Amino acid sequence: MGMDRNTIIGFVLIGGLLMAMFYFNSKSQLAYEGEQKRIADSIDQVKKKAEAIVAKTTVAAKPDSASPSFLNFGFASTSQEDSIVTLENNKIKIAFHNRGGQPGKVILKDFKTYDGKSVEMNSGRFNKLTYRINTPLNRSAEVSDILFTHQPVQKKEDGSQSIIFETSDSTGKKISHKYTLSANDYMLQMQISFDDADQLLSTQDLNLLWQNEAPYIERDHKYELTQTHIGFLEKGDFDFEYVGEGDQKKLTNTKWLGNKQQFFLSTLISQNEFKEANASWYLPKDSKDHYLIRTNHSFVCPLVRQGNHADVPLSMYFGPSDYNELKKHNVGLEYFVPYGNGIFAFVKYINRYFLLPVFDFIQHNVMNMGIVILLITLLIRLITSPILYKSYLSGAKMKVLKPEVDALKEKYKDDQQAFGMEQMKLWKSAGVSPLGGCLPALLQIPIFMSLYYFFQSNIDLRGKSFLWANDLAQYDNIASIPFSIPFYGDHVSLFTITAVITSLLISIYSMSNMQDNSNPLMKYMPYIFPVLLLGVFNSLPAALTWYYTVSNTITLILQIIIQKYIIDHDKIMAQIAENRKKPVKKSKMQERIEAMQESQKKLQDLKNKNSNKG
């Protein structure tokens, strides 16, 4: 009982598709490396322009210190310098600056960085949320430069907290920023309000600028970068941009726009829709800059008017890319979690509606996440075992028919079309499908790929240890190499080695039972592919390589059990003999195939006849 040619083709196709998937997943990193020089040059140009603009703006906007009416650009404030006030709940702590009345450093209480520090977002001088307003005496200023006065933090019985920042000029024009943070939530509600909006703003909409810097959070910065995207919901459809491709994206009718790192999001959301949004970003020259990416996102926000009063209702999400957490906000943020992309986008439905509920159920009853992965993999392999059984059963039938196929091959060795037709007749009379070994293997691809994306994207694996792996969301490192080996790296992942070894064992066992080893491609490809995995898997999260090890081990055990103890050769031969006694009923598809083969045979015979006459 061995693996027939079609079964091997199926597994080779799986390997090819898997390699294609790794290619697409590394697309952002390849693009990033290809654009480094261009990005570095563009950053220098942008910085020079920015410095010139800042210098001009500073001179133009510099108030006359001798004239109190020009202090704070003509807006009232009880403070002469920036101060900080905080809102917090059990999940998040947000610091607000009265300069600009805007959010500053965000601390996620339940998460740590790779070096044990609290995860901080929106931290640093680069981060700001601002817009331009008209000030007295026909001047203008960025609201991020204006000092606001804030009221005391309001705490409600439901656990929510809110704060209002206000400023006004001598004529009564007033600006207020209200922020509300609910209990047990990462979403920050925000409302910008204007009294006398037509005088404060030069346009009918609010032109908002959001600058955000994504810091290093994970240990493997290079892999973290490949998982960093600019995501948006435009006209009701989610899409994203690799940060290594281009540096800007223009959008219309956009619900939200945000930056996703490997496991964390920073997102600005409109209660209505942004009329326009322009996303732009650039990458650091090297790791010494201590950030992954900087973004400059601009928005055209519609005003909700009531007479001369206008509001801009917004929300900001700073938190984990947890599918369940994001989904509860009902604005489509859960699409950020990459449960399936590119040619494998369809597997996201398997992950969302099957694997995630199963995973949640198991992890609530099992403490160790490595055991959770083992149990899920075992469950999936048992569910797909009938497919595996059909594949090996088809191989066993092919092996029984092999002597007759070899006889036909010898008889029609000079006429491949005739051989193909007779082989089809033989298979049909015996009740054997030529695709019986290939299709079951291909049908396993969606399951395999859904598990791949699921374990790669699930934040619940982050920081969880198992055996020698300290973090299942990062590669396991049992030894460091003082230099980098091409296509491998500078470290040794033991789970990768176990995955490769189990893959080789499957190949060795399968090839030992294969009835036809004459084709060099069929003979060596199953051995080459596992070795290629050594370089591909070495920097992948330990959860993936552990899953692959478990999956291979279970597959090998099932393969031995099915072939040694379940498949009965005598029954197969008896079934084939019984099928031959039955009248052969051809399907329409088979009739068309045989008709085409017959036509091709007649055409070839005619060509041969004319050739002989010549």
Give the predicted meaning of each segment:
Residues 19, 28, 66-71, 92, ...:
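A general marker of short, structured functional hotspots
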Residues 33-34, 38-42, 66-78:
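N-terminal, polar/Ser/Thr-rich
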